[in-house]
Amino acid sequence: MQKRILCYAIACLFSLDVLSQYIYEANQSLIDLTNQSGTTSLNAADDQVSSVFNLGFTFDFYGEAFTQGRIATNGCLHFKTTGAYCSDFTPDPLASQYTYTLLPFWTDLIRDNDSSMLAKSFSDKTVFGWYDMREYNRASDNSFEVILWTNDTFE
């Protein structure tokens, strides 16, 4: 019985370690707004929220209609008026204040000189992008995007 419990405990610890190493890879390449015309810079200082960006259409998110959003350095897209909590990343469980928020890569990100936070509206979508953002205490950069489609879906 003790051997069975020990084996189960080791298997659980191994499983947790494997899960903590998970990397998400999207099904498509980045649209990459960095060299496109008509792109709006939403660069914000470290741990700050950008100015408001108009989506160019009404986006229904959990029963509420939105026409604008703002992004934060730490990988947050928020649809309400301030979204100030998006600027303060903590690894704690998410509270109810994160309603009407997408967290595509919620971590402590640093915007260096080569980094950019951009947005652009197209006829069928709006793209918010974080490019070459460095994680706190890490050397490598991350680039990711959120796409809001006019049919009220996102990826």
Regions found by a protein language model. Give the residues of each.
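Von Willebrand factor type D
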Residues: 21-155
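Positively charged n-region of N-terminal signal peptides that target proteins for export
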Residues: 1-5
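Short, linear, compositionally biased motifs with a strong N-terminal bias
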Residues: 11-12
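Cleavable N-terminal signal peptides
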Residues: 8, 18-19
